[in-house]
Amino acid sequence: MKTIEEKINYYKESLDLFDDGMDKYKFLIDQAKNAKIFPEEYRNDSFKVSGCQAQVWLVPKLKENKLSFYYDSDAFISKGMVTILCDIYGDRNPSEIKNSDFSMLNTLELDTLLTPGRRNGVYSMLEKIKEYANSYI
C-alpha cells in the first residue's frame, strides 16, 4: 500500500499532466465518476459535511484498526475532491492520519484551481477526516 506522501505525489503528477484548468476539472470529474457506490442509508444530516457549497457526506468505518470512508456528493467537483482525499487518507490507522503532514496537500495547488467556496469545502472535508481519525484513537 502506498504511503500518504506517495498518494499525494501520484495526484500531483496526475494533475501536472494538464496545462489547462478545465482539463484538471475533467480529471476531478473522472475521479467522481469512478467512485464507489454510496450506501443510501448514510445519506442523512448526521454524516453531512458542513462548510461545503455542495452536499457532501462522509462516513467513517473502522475495520481491523484501519479507518476508511464511504463518501458522496451531489456535485461532481466536490465528489472528485472527496474521492481523492478518501483515497489518500483512507484504509489507514487513525494515528497515521492524525500524525500526517496535511500541508503536503498544498503541493496539489488546489488553491489555484478551485474557487474560494470549493477550497473551503475541501478544508471542511479534511477537518472531518481528522475529526473521525481522532475519534478512533
Where are the predicted features?
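N-terminal intrinsically disordered, cationic/polar leader segments
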Residues: 1-55, 62-66, 105-124, 128-137
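Solvent-exposed interaction patches of small proteins and small membrane subunits
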Residues: 46-53, 69-73, 95-100
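Conserved interaction-surface patches within small, structured recognition/assembly domains
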Residues: 61-75, 86-90
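Short Cys/His-based metal-binding microdomains
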Residues: 77-81
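Glycine-rich phosphate/pyrophosphate-binding loops
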Residues: 91-108
